Amino acid sequence: MARSYPFVFIFLATALCIVSAYYLHFPFNLCADTEADYLDSARVIRVHVLEPPVSKPYGYMLSVRLLSMYEADSVRLLSQQALLRLETDTAHAVVPQTGDILLVRTRVVRPHALFKGDFDYGRYLRLQHKVGIAYVRSSQCRTIGNVPVRTLRAKAAACQQRLVRRYADAGLFGSALAFVSAITLGEKDELDSSLRQSFAAAGAAHVLAVSGLHTGIIYAVVVALLTFFGRRRPLYEQRLRRALLSAAILLIMWAYAFVTGLSPSVLRAVLMLTIVQVGWVLRRQAISLNTLAAAACICLFADPLSLFSVSFQLSFSAVLGILLFVPYLNSLWPAERKSVRYVRDVITVSIAAVAGTLPVTLYYYGQVARYFLLTNLVVLPAAFVLVVLGIATLVLAHTLLGTWLAAALQLLSTWLCRYVEWIEHLSGATLQLTVTPWMVMCLVLCLLCSYLFIRKRRLVWAIVCVVVMAGFCVSHVYDAREAAQQQTFAVRGRVLYYKHGESIDSYKLENKFTFFRFGETDYVYALYVSGKKYKALQDYCAERQITIVENR
């Protein structure tokens, strides 16, 4: 019998990894990004559009590759990627398409977090292999050619657009078209921001992002359709049938992963399904922690920076929570009737997934839905029906039956969105809580200790869990008191007033982006407040309950 190592070594190794990641976070986050310093000033730059433009209220957001920069007497060749924010001057402005070569006059800005605890958009862009973001008006942008983009993601995006048009041809329109395209194809560019917020507040944001839920639905449908081939055969033929069936299933699943853009969550799900199918052919155990670890290793081998992707972290933490906690939660509620077992499974899986993703969700979004159980009891079966109807509509788009299916999709998606909006408007639908990396580490350790207590039934793990949660609460109280000392940000004319505690400081604003430092660690980007910039400042202040006294 193989030697069994005490579980405490696994606990200590995990704790060491968490602490190491916590300390490694700071050098990465605070190190000076010296790359592309020559892009800080406005220059004429030639760029290549890599992906379809994303519609925004101000115009379009483009993912581009910087090709060259024109200086006074020379041309500098570039190779970095960036985001290009294109503001349309007129309603008839020409929209660049994938593959277009543009000539723009702009500068690349590397954003910084405005206040302590704010989302660091500049760090996010670096993790997406982008040096920054450039702002340009459509009148300052000229198309000078087109070079087709031949990357795998570009081909996937083009395939997505063709399938979205099939939905439109079948009769889907408006918000229903955007919603169905999001949950079946992963095309979320046309989703309204208010709808995204509604699903997040109701605890159903996972439905909008194609992930293991949607991949599992497609997998179940494909298996159901293919398993009627052949009946019980002798052993050799049975093995051959298993191999052929698995090959067909995996071919379809990887094609679906390609269509949805090869996001980390879909890759994780399809990789796990691949391992499951291989195990089924070899008659081995299917889903386990080893399967999840193998999928994570393959994803990180392909792209190490995906470790810092929110999608990657949410996907793997949700599955980890389900694998660890669901067996024990199910044992607390034995259910024999099918209907009762369905309700139990939805509840236990939802609780386990929320528990697994809680540290990540609080760190990035600062909120958690209180009524996620009420939401998932309705949303999960509705999502199954929507995905099945959506795939059937794509297949039968130009037939009478396809038109009927599209009408059913339109009705069901509209009803589901209204239900989610109703959940959002219930009293106390969300719990707002901003956490620091230290508090995230406390939450992870608390979840790990809870699992060890359930598994080992030893009081020491419960005591450790209570101590860790006490540390979490102390840290939260300290941060709340510190935040209370820095509340008000006001602008009057060209003077910025900043209140921290009982004192008020004032700073003159320049006619450009200005960098300010308050106290020891808080940073603010302020700008000369007039016109559209003042509207942007208003939106920012309203979102964070910051007061603008007067603007002249």
Regions found by a protein language model. Name each.
Residues 172-176, 241-248, 382:
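Membrane-interfacial loop-to-helix junctions in multi-pass transporters
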Residues 142-157, 161, 201, 362-378, ...:
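Membrane-interface amphipathic/re-entrant loop segments adjacent to transmembrane helices
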